[in-house]
């Protein structure tokens, strides 16, 4: 798997970039979509499909600053609070939720929680709060 400079390759999964500039979920997805490796497809917020992929992405999250932070958006939407869907349209076949999450907000987004409480597991974030977090983008490999 070949990637652009400053992107991390995970063989069999894709290319990943940690973006430290906090944005809302929708702004982050839009930013990721602007990354495009030409004919190979568009970027999206990162989807996660295996323990190996999760561990590689978790290693990109800075160390804990408190019980919950840093929180980092991934490309997971929660429809009706419980139905997860990846922004890239891929199959939801892996999960790593913290505690009782997702806990039935009307709608929500998924984020890594790098703080000491969840230690990198996922938390759900209310859509109505317009929280801004750093985020992870994913691109197809450049072949």
Curated annotation (Swiss-Prot):
- Keyword tRNA processing assigned to the entry: answer is no
* Free-text function comment from the UniProt entry: May be calcium-dependent and galactose-specific.
Does the record bear Transcription regulation in its keywords? Answer: no
Record-linked PANTHER family = MANNOSE, PHOSPHOLIPASE, LECTIN RECEPTOR RELATED (PTHR22803)
| Entry protein name | Lectin 1
Q: Which UniProt keywords apply?
A: Calcium, Lectin
Domain C-type lectin: residue ranges = 11-138
Q: Which residues form a coiled coil?
A: none
Cite the Gene3D superfamilies for this sequence. Answer: Mannose-Binding Protein A, subunit A
Record GO terms (molecular function): carbohydrate binding
| Cross-referenced Pfam families | Lectin_C
Q: Which organism is it from?
A: Stichopus japonicus (Sea cucumber)
- Going by the entry's taxonomy, the superkingdom of the source organism is recorded as Eukaryota
Enumerate the InterPro entries for this protein. C-type_lectin-like, C-type_lectin-like/link_sf, C-type_lectin/snaclec_domain, CTDL_fold
